Amino acid sequence: MRRWLCRAVLIAAALFVADLALAPSIRAAEKVDLLLVLASDVSRSVDAEKFKLQREGYASAISDKRVLDAIAAGRNKRIAVLFLEWSGVGNQKVVIDWTPIDGAKAAQEFADKLLELPRAFADRTSISGGIEFAVAQFPRAPFAAERQTIDVSGDGTNNSGRDVTLARDEALAKGITINGLVILSDSPLPWNPEHTNPPGGLDGYYRNNVIGGAGAFVMVADNHDSFGQAIVKKMIAEIAFNPPPRGVILR
């Protein structure tokens, strides 16, 4: 009898340990319609006022009814979002980790948190570093999705780290789509005008060097004041997977 009890206890303990081991994988299999990394430029060209407008724009967009309607129209009726900030080489930080957005409450909580948290960096502009860091976030997402997208916003060209096209191509090889949100500058930087206003325009630079993958596109915000509305349009297109024709730049 005692031997039988010991065996029963051991079996129960083994099953309990197995359940604990399975729990993370079960959570990892929870399905969403999209894994979306919002990668925000906080380099030196983004001053305090521009930074404030960017954060407010993202917060407003994630909780916008039109964005929530697009989420609700998906098969799983939710997406997972991660928000990170990047600037120079080695300067990347997850500001808000993977969060499921499945309605107004979750979206508002995400938005409120985004408005509260401090700025991560203010350095040079390594778009390549931002992309590499964003790519590394997908394998640890506690959700599963058929689509993985990096949404890169920025107001200048890559001037730090390795060639941005190398980072882009590595992301595309993993099946990740990169979209761009270009923030145009009213006037070029006095000390480096081609950083914010390169030949062919910053939108052209992003189209040729940054974006790629299924349905990739560039959205343009004419300035930081119009950033909020631009990110709303961009997120709706990404969530609904309704991109513009290839090569078209949206405003």
Set out the residue ranges of the language-model regions.
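VWA/integrin I-like adhesion module and closely mimicked acidic/polar interface patches used
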Residues: 157-205
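DG-centered beta-turn motif at the end of beta-strands
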Residues: 41-42, 134, 146-160, 167, ...
